[in-house]
Amino acid sequence: MWSGHRADLFGEPNQEIKKIMKLLNSLYRIVSESVTESGRDYNIVLDAEHFIYKAHFPGEPITPGVCIMQIAVELLSLHCGKPLAIDTVKNIKFLKIISPAETPGVCFSVSKVEAEDSKVKAQVSVSGGGETYAKLSLICKAK
């Protein structure tokens, strides 16, 4: 189990990556990270008390799609070891809502990562409790 500090596994993220990690240790924290055959899994816990959930939606918190995308980019940046930004969203499917009250822990699975020039293609699947919440196919560029 990861204590929340990347140094436990692979060393501290560099300063450039830290700059783009807008939601890490705020909206979510990483509880474990593991290498898989197809990429890497990041098990995260969402903070149901985060101010985003006060507005989206009061009494019925739902993780906004834009936050799911940002978390995916942050975790892909960690995976690649460099800061990335979305260049193109090839495909995105939000299959079920993610409520931090009902499902505080989810897994972001980063796979099919291909680096070409200054761009990185990847697929990210968000799942937990036997459910798939979202699937993203992204092309990111180095920041």
Provide a role label for each language-model segment:
Residues 59-64, 68-69, 73:
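Compact, glycine-rich, soluble single-domain proteins
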